[in-house]
């Protein structure tokens, strides 16, 4: 249900209107996902998963709860204890993870890689928790529970430039699939509170700066905005109203591999510390979904629409033909609306619900085996076979490009 106090193009109002999710006081900063919203969420997750698996990442899963000792060693306890949900006390004190990187480090230490195994790329769609102040919570854009498309690259010094450049080259094409073509980049440098010495920070900042300079990417340098363990490149998407939303990031980290003593065996048999790159495409799935709604409103790209096609029979006698059309569209997300409302009202409801394609079938369509397809901006009547092909093409355009690299 849409909140009447919100502007109609606010993502929170759209989430209610489109029946995607809701929030309530008993779970502040956490979304209750409805079937339509969960469909959209899973589509975003699947797109990111296809992209990273095609890029040589291996997917893992790490525990939600880790003992305090892990967070002290990573530096998160000292820097962010107030924003972590802690449970227990004494030696059993633990915290829900606000990030997945310490868990990934535990896996890599067990894998004990050699130089032949590097770069080692690990990905996780990890649910994380952060105790954000109540006044800062803002729909899907600022939550206490959310899912990071978290990835880490463990590599050698010599591999840093190639890995960062590869990420930077591929990201614009990934965002373009969702309708974002204006992407800006910021280089965030050492904050006042940080891990590691100045020499390591000099080296890390120089490495990221050299990569973007080599690629010819203009950057906005932001002193003091880096992560506690290293500098980062941040990617902001500009929406249809000119607002910038920070989403993707890649961060260079020499500190955490040293704190956890994460090493690889080089070609000479020596054990050396790995370099760790933290990276994300969306930042969080929930936040990116909110940004999508702020950008597209209810008119999401057809491949992302929770319901892609609404088949509207003119009268009850056209229901069997509508069922036949739906049977030809197996694999798409299709509904039939043969309710008691007028034809015009049912078509309007479909568009109000964000359904991008409406297939209208009446006497002439049944007799001539055709379908009238009404999109958001035009209408065309096609023979049944052509109509099915047209609908499939519209609904799958861009949907299967997740495995393509460097588009």
Where are these regions (language model features)?
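NTP/phosphate- and nucleic-acid-binding module
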Residues: 1-407
């Amino acid at each position: 249900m849409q909140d009447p106090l919100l502007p109609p193009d606010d993502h929170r109002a759209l989430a209610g209107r489109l029946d995607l999710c809701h929030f309530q006081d008993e779970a502040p900063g956490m979304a209750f996902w409805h079937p339509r919203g969960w469909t959209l969420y899973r589509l975003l997750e699947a797109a990111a998963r296809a992209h990273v698996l095609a890029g040589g990442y291996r997917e893992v899963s790490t525990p939600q709860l880790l003992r305090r000792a892990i967070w002290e060693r990573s530096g998160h306890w000292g820097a962010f204890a107030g924003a972590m949900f802690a449970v227990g006390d004494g030696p059993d004190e633990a915290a829900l993870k606000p990030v997945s990187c310490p868990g990934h480090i535990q896996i890599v230490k067990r894998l004990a890689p050699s130089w032949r195994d590097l770069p080692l790329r690990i990905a996780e769609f990890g649910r994380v928790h952060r105790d954000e102040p109540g006044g800062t919570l803002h729909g899907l854009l600022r939550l206490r529970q959310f899912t990071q498309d978290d990835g880490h690259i463990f590599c050698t010094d010599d591999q840093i430039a190639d890995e960062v450049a590869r990420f930077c080259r591929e990201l614009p094409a990934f965002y373009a699939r969702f309708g974002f073509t204006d992407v800006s980049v910021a280089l965030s440098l050492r904050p006042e509170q940080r891990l590691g010495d100045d020499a390591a920070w000099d080296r890390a900042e120089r490495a990221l700066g050299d990569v973007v300079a080599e690629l010819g990417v203009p950057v906005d340098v932001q002193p003091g905005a880096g992560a506690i363990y290293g500098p980062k490149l941040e990617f902001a998407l500009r929406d249809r109203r000119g607002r910038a939303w920070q989403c993707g990031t890649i961060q260079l980290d020499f500190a955490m591999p040293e704190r956890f003593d994460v090493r690889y065996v080089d070609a000479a048999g020596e054990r050396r510390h790995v370099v760790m790159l933290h990276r994300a495409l969306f930042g969080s799935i929930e936040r990116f979904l909110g940004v999508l709604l702020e950008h597209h409103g209810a008119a999401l790209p057809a491949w992302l629409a929770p319901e892609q096609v609404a088949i509207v029979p003119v009268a009850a006698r056209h229901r069997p033909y509508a069922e036949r059309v739906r049977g030809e569209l197996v694999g798409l997300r299709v509904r039939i609306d043969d309710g008691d409302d007028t034809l015009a009202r049912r078509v309007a409801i479909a568009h109000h619900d964000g359904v991008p394609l409406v297939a209208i079938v009446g006497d002439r369509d049944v007799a001539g085996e055709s379908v009238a397809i009404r999109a958001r901006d035009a209408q065309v009547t096609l023979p049944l076979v052509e109509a099915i092909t047209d609908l499939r093409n519209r609904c799958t355009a861009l949907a299967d490009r997740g495995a393509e690299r460097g588009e």
